[in-house]
Structures are given as C-alpha cells and as structure tokens.
Amino acid sequence: MGSPGMVLGLLVQIWALQEASSLSVQQGPNLLQVRQGSQATLVCQVDQATAWERLRVKWTKDGAILCQPYITNGSLSLGVCGPQGRLSWQAPSHLTLQLDPVSLNHSGAYVCWAAVEIPELEEAEGNITRLFVDPDDPTQNRNRIASFPGFLFVLLGVGSMGVAAIVWGAWFWGRRSCQQRDSGNSPGNAFYSNVLYRPRGAPKKSEDCSGEGKDQRGQSIYSTSFPQPAPRQPHLASRPCPSPRPCPSPRPGHPVSMVRVSPRPSPTQQPRPKGFPKVGEE
C-alpha cells in the first residue's frame, strides 16, 4: 500500500479534476421592469471547463417549462420559446431569451437551466430573473400631462371666439333695429296728411244751402299715411240752414271759401234779373 500522503494527493487531484469539469450557469438581470407592448431580453450564460458535444437547456416561468431545446455543434434545435418568445445562441456560452412584444401575462420569475449529457451528465441552474410588466407607459403619461395645458389653451381660444361672435351678432342686430326705427319703418312712427280738395270756380249766389251742401259733399279728401292709413271719419251730410241764418261754416283749419247767400224769396216774389231797374224806376 502507498503512504497516506500519496493517497491524500490523489484525492486532491481527483477533486480538482471534478471542479475543473463542473458546469455553471449565470443569469441576468435579476430584476427587469418594462412597459406593456415593449421588448424584454433575458440572458443565460453557460460555463464549463471541458469541451462538450451536446448541451440541453431549459427556460421555466413560475416553475412551468417554456421550452427545452438542444444545442449541438453550436446550433439550436428550437428557436421558439413560449408565447412571443425567441431563443438565440451565441458561442461559446450565451443563450438569450427575447420576449417581443410583452404583455401583462409575461410577468413572473424566469429561471435558466442547463445540462451536459455527453461525455458525462452534469446539471446547473441559474438564479431567478423577475420580470414586471407595467400596464401603462409613464413616458406617455408625462406627455399627456405636458400637453394638457396646451389643450386647455385651445379650448379657451375657441370659447373666446364663440363669445365674441355672439356679442358681435347682438350688436349688429340692435344697430339694425335702431336704423329701422329711425327711418320710419316702425308702426308707431306714422305720418298722416289730409288734403282738402275744392273745385275751381265760386258757387253762384242763387244756390241755396242745399247746393252748398252738395258742394261740400262733392269735396274730396285725400289721405296719405306711412305706413298705415289714417282712419277715415264718417262723412256727415250738411243739413239745410234755416232762413235767414247762413249755413254754418266748415270747421276752422280747412281752406274753404265762404259764400254769403240771401234768404230764399217768397213764392210771390220772383228773383229779378241782374241789371234791370225796378218798376217805376228809369
């Protein structure tokens, strides 16, 4: 048998070989927060001291397997991993999971796992990457808040223009109404004019009061009104004047000529023609 020192040295060499051929997995980032509809990238780094021919990898979310492809001679056997997930391998040791676009269902804890099957079976698991998906975009919210004063300014401008238009319309309507009243178009501002018509020629002296009444009845009255005609008074026929008083004169204010009429002669006394002397006179 060998000495105890030789046995101890052999054990140390075997342990060193085992450590040199061990498999390690590092995962990042530990925490990732993105907005809904954007892109999320998770990285898994697989390290092994010795060369390997076949590597099996696996991604899980909250303990559920998303995908489990193989890597042989630097190529992936599967490029899809879960909903909206794509895998890519970059030699010698980088495995990337890309989620595009992310939704609220992508929030959770992601773990990368790797195993070497040839030449010997070895397994390793990475740390946890926690993914949080925000339903709203803080940047868009800030943009909405920043644009809100501008929107208020636009509303204020439109409201001012509307008020100005209403005031101008009221002023124009009032001015037009005043002009119509000043021009006499208002029903309360009517002008009336009475014209008394008298036929040419003076009446004969032999005509009695009844004849004058006929002349008065023959007189015409013209009335002009703007815009409404003046109400016409009922025409009153002149009554014959008793002898020997003359007929009453028309109302003052009307240019009517007055004719003096002598009393009506008796039946025995006939009117004498003008220009002949009386009996006994020469």
UniProtKB/Swiss-Prot annotation:
It is a single-pass type I membrane protein. Plays a role in cell-cell interaction, cell migration, and angiogenesis. Through interaction with HHLA2, costimulates T-cells in the context of TCR-mediated activation. Enhances T-cell proliferation and cytokine production via an AKT-dependent signaling cascade. Widely expressed, mainly by epithelial and endothelial cells, including bronchial epithelial cells of lung, breast glandular and lobular epithelia cells, urothelium of the bladder, skin epidermis, epithelium of gastrointestinal, rectum, endometrial glands of the uterus, ureter, fallopian tube epithelium, colonic epithelium, small bowl epithelium, stomach epithelium, including both chief and parietal cells, trophoblastic epithelium of placenta, and pancreatic acinar cells (at protein level). Consistently expressed in veins and arteries (at protein level). Glycans are attached at residues 73, 105, 127. The keyword Iron does not apply. Residues 1-22 form the signal peptide. It comes from the Eukaryota. Residues 218-227 have a biased composition (Polar residues). Residues 204-217 have a biased composition (Basic and acidic residues). May form homophilic interactions that could regulate cell-cell interaction. Interacts with CACNB2, DST, MIA and NCKIPSD. Interacts with HHLA2. It comes from Homo sapiens (Human). CDD domains: Ig (cd00096). This is Transmembrane and immunoglobulin domain-containing protein 2. Its main location: membrane.
